[in-house]
Amino acid sequence: QGALPKGNDGLGLMLLGVTGDQMLPLDIYQKIKRDTLTQVRGTVQADILKEDQAQNTCIFSTEFALRLMGDVQQYFIDQGVRNFYSVSISGYHIAEAGANPITQLAFTLANGFTYVEYYLSRGMDINEFAPNLSFFFSNGIDPEYAVIGRVARRIWAKALKNKYGANDRAQMLKYHIQTSGRSLHAQEIDFNDI
């Protein structure tokens, strides 16, 4: 914030290295920050259990990663972040590592329940964090893939309602599916060197 060179009126330079809290009155800046956090949408893909089970790419211990994930979820609760998923619980990678559709679903839901139990152990309310969880499944030509989403939703909703007393919003399992690269290779056996 030093003196400008002689002959420079400062136009165009005032924004360099200046943050919002320096440009705006503090109350307006805080309101924009608060409103942005309540409206922003997205997904954190930080499923440490999938990393350990399917990819073997953990750079942190499971305990540290769970604590970090719990910290992110607690921040979401404290700041009213309702439209951003704190974790995408991933079965896709488990399937790519060799699981069939049923095993993929079993491991993925088990991982989801592990996060639920961990967040509850930290004192979080099921109705505040469960809506911030999302799921990611693999899709292929096996007939079980046709129902994987419906089965997952039914199991999740019943467990969250009956075991954890979750409200309707918290019982909803949100997911997306991508085509399995592994299933595409099997269709072109002449090009598959395996």
Where is each model-derived feature located?
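Catalytic alpha/beta active-site cores
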Residues: Q1-I148, K163-Q178
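Thiamine diphosphate
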Residues: E144, L184-I194
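Conserved, mostly hydrophobic/aromatic
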Residues: W156
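Catalytic core of soluble alpha/beta enzymes
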Residues: A159
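Cytosolic juxtamembrane amphipathic/interface segments immediately preceding
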Residues: S180-R182
